[in-house]
Amino acid sequence: MSSIDKRIKEIVAEQLGVDEGQVTNEASFMDDLGADSLDTVELVMALEEEFDIEISDEDAEKIQSVQDAIDYITDHT
């Protein structure tokens, strides 16, 4: 696991208040980790801050799972 993957999983666990063991690459923020729409907005903001990037609203809507976040961050950093 790359350091980006690990850091994203740590942020997801922290933001959503779940155990890191639940944060798998396939985990959907809403379906598997219990996030609501506000949680996902806050999660995107935390990722923007951590990786010093700006995620457009259009792109943010496409980030639905841990793997989506990893792919986006990897492609944009």
Swiss-Prot record:
Alphabetical list of Pfam families matching this protein: PP-binding
Domain Carrier: 2-77
UniProt-listed InterPro entries: ACP, ACP-like_sf, PP-bd_ACP, Ppantetheine_attach_site
Subcellular location field: Cytoplasm
Gene3D superfamilies hit by this protein: ACP-like (1.10.1200.10)
Domain of life where this protein originates: Bacteria
Pathway: Lipid metabolism; fatty acid biosynthesis
Presence of the UniProt keyword tRNA processing in the record: no
Post-translational modification, as annotated: 4'-phosphopantetheine is transferred from CoA to a specific serine of apo-ACP by AcpS. This modification is essential for activity because fatty acids are bound in thioester linkage to the sulfhydryl of the prosthetic group.
Stored SUPFAM superfamilies: ACP-like
MF term (GO), any: acyl carrier activity
Keyword Oxidoreductase in annotation: no
The protein's role, per its UniProt record: Carrier of the growing fatty acid chain in fatty acid biosynthesis.
Family: Belongs to the acyl carrier protein (ACP) family.
PANTHER family given in the database record: ACYL CARRIER PROTEIN (PTHR20863), CARRIER DOMAIN-CONTAINING PROTEIN (PTHR20863:SF76)
Protein name: Acyl carrier protein
Lineage: Bacteria, Pseudomonadati, Thermodesulfobacteriota, Desulfuromonadia, Geobacterales
Gene: acpP
